[in-house]
Amino acid sequence: MNKPLKPSQVFIGSDHAGLHLAEFVQHFLKDKDFKIQTFLPAMRVDYPDYAKLVCQKVLENAQSYGILVCATGIGMSMGANRFKGIRAALCLDAYMAKMTRLHNNANVLCLGEKISGIGVVESILEAFFSTEFEQGRHVLRIQKLDESLKS
């Protein structure tokens, strides 16, 4: 991992369909000395509940990030983006992860267990956590995203 960003903490959540990939992500980041807190289910759960848990933690903890996993990542990304201040991105490859950090300052990464293999997920995590926000013209665009949420 090139020059990894060191967030204050990474919050990882998944529903039952993303549990195995979420556990892999947890171990991968712990091996790189990231501070991790997990919200992983012991039974069948509803993904919006876990998206909410992780997003609330990210909003409460400056300089933290979230990772959400479900079967496809779609439901988690939809749920996460309902929160003002959350910029969640469903990433399917390292380029998407790099660009969402560079241009969108994403603070929540969404992954799909049935979509991405372990090798791809490793490259996504490396790109996401080694790319800094470019700022510049992108700051106004992000402000406009938050303005569109009335909550």
Residue ranges and their predicted role:
Residues D33-Q37, I86-D93:
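Short hydrophobic/aromatic-enriched beta-strand-loop microsegments
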Residues E23-Q26, G79-R82, L102, E122:
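Short amphipathic alpha-helical segments
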Residues K35-D46:
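A short beta-strand-loop structural module common to alpha/beta enzyme folds
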Residues L5, F11-G13, A17-G18, A94-S151:
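C-terminal binding/interaction regions
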Residues K6-S8, A62-S64, G85-I86, N104-A106:
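Short coil/turn connectors at secondary-structure junctions
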